[in-house]
Structures are given as structure tokens and as C-alpha cells.
């Protein structure tokens, strides 16, 4: 069952965070349970809003919970595709200076997203979905001019987008799409004279009711709980 049917909720319906306190997101290989107020709030916002920002340090469950919600949405046919985005500029590296084709260049930057998908769906199934472009890897530079309809979009490490790049991602969202934008404002690898797109958009849009923002902290690290799905007891 998807999380909405489990809770008898619908997208856009307001509910208390307490309603999410013991909820598991069920995926074929793992059941994922949010722990702590911030993770529960984050899950609530992902399921009730079209655009959500998760901000905070690594290890707080931002990526894993977003991928779990995306897998749930895909398997329950609320979206047609998953689109994975991660800035390919980190610690001074750019795509053009990395060896290999586009897929090989982008894949290392998406490893945390792939790892989460493999845990929930298995490597073979993920690879088949990638081949069919049901799961799509979308480098920022290749989003220009596109409209992403009926997609669940996840952008990781968004602190390393520029203002223009962040605007481009947000304006790619089309009909029936949802986006979760994650980042850590203490880990910006952009040149010092360039403003982080994440920092900028949070300052501009933080009070917009239709947008969800969850701020994580060190107390959220390692709180995430997973258990094998009854459908997959292979360990």
C-alpha cells in the first residue's frame, strides 16, 4: 500500500505531523520509517506539497526518504518517471574535465541516489528502469528547454547550483510533477563570488505556503530506520 492509502490521506490534505510518526514507506526490498520530528515533517511535506526543500547535514535521511517517496509514487502510478539531478560541479571539478561518456561522467555524482534505489528496488530492476528511461539521469545543462510532466524530480547537493541553475530546475516542473530539492548550506563548493542557488531560493521563497522547507540538524543523523520488506527477505 502507498502511504496515502495506509493513512487514508490525499495529496494536498493537511494533517498533523503526529499522523506520520509511525508510518513506513513500503518499497519492494525495504520498509523505511521516519524517526524524529524533522524526518516526520519532511515526509508529510513531500506527500502534501509539490515542491519541498530538505536542508541540513549528510546522514540525516534527506536523500533516502526522498527516494523512498519517489519509488512509492512510481510504483503506485502517481508519476510516470523519476528524474534524478545533481550538480556536477564539486570541489572544482566540471563534467568536461572528467573521462568517459555522459552517463559515466554523471553517475559518480549520483551515487547516493543510486545506492538508495538499489536498496529499495534491487540493481537489476533499477537498471531496467534506467534503460527504459523510466528513471532518468538529467544533467543540469541538458534540462534547458524541457518541461517535465508527471515526474518525481529529486535534486541532491543543490547547494552547488547557481541562482540561474536553480531557477532553470524549478521552471522545468510541469503538470503532475513533484520536486524534492536537497542540500547542505555548509558544504558549498562554488567559487566564493557566486551565490548558491539553494541559499538564494530559500531566502526568496521560504514563506510561500505552497512550498515545504524542512531544516535538519545533527540530532537527525542516523535516525532513519529500515527493515526488510516481507516481499524481500533475502537480506
Question: What residue spans do the PLM features occupy?
Answer:
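Interdomain "pre-motor" coupling segment immediately N-terminal to P-loop NTPase/helicase cores
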Residues: 1-18
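Conserved small/polar residues in nucleotide/adenosyl-binding loops
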Residues: 225-230
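Hydrophobic anchor at the beta1->P-loop junction of P-loop NTPases
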Residues: 54
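Pre-Walker A adenine-sensing motif
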Residues: 37-45
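Conserved P-loop
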Residues: 64-129, 193-207
